[in-house]
């Protein structure tokens, strides 16, 4: 699994856990709906740290909590 897939999967998981839609996340995080859609559809190759931080704010979690999953613990460095 690459970076963008792992991030998209984590966002979907958090939306499901909190019972919010991607549109609702756009409202609470101040991240444009088009940006969230791009991340979830795998069109965004590398979501920026500021965007992920805003999404975390919308979820009311820290960056550490966002990345604190087994998927990210086993991440290998991607060199391209």
What are the functions of these language-model segments?
Residues 1-23:
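A short, Lys/Arg-rich alpha-helix, primarily the initiator
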Residues 14, 28, 39, 69:
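Residues in the recognition helix of alpha-helical DNA-binding motifs
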Residues 15, 26, 56:
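The alpha-helix within a helix-turn-helix
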Residues 19-38:
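Short alpha-helical DNA-recognition segment
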Residues 32, 43, 70-74:
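The DNA-recognition helices of helix-turn-helix-type DNA-binding domains
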Residues 38, 67-80:
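Short, charged recognition helix plus adjacent turn
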Residues 43-57:
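Short, basic-rich loop-to-helix N-cap that marks the start of a DNA-contacting helix
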Residues 57-65:
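Intrinsically disordered, low-complexity basic tails/linkers immediately adjacent to helix-turn-helix/homeobox/MYB/SANT
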């Amino acid at each position: 699994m690459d970076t963008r897939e792992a991030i998209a999967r984590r966002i979907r998981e958090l939306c499901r856990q909190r019972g919010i839609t991607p549109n609702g996340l756009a409202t609470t995080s101040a991240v444009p709906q088009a940006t969230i859609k791009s991340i979830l559809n795998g069109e965004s190759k590398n979501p920026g740290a500021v965007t992920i931080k805003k999404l975390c704010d919308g979820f009311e979690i820290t960056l550490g909590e966002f990345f604190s999953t087994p998927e990210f613990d086993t991440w290998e460095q991607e060199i391209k």
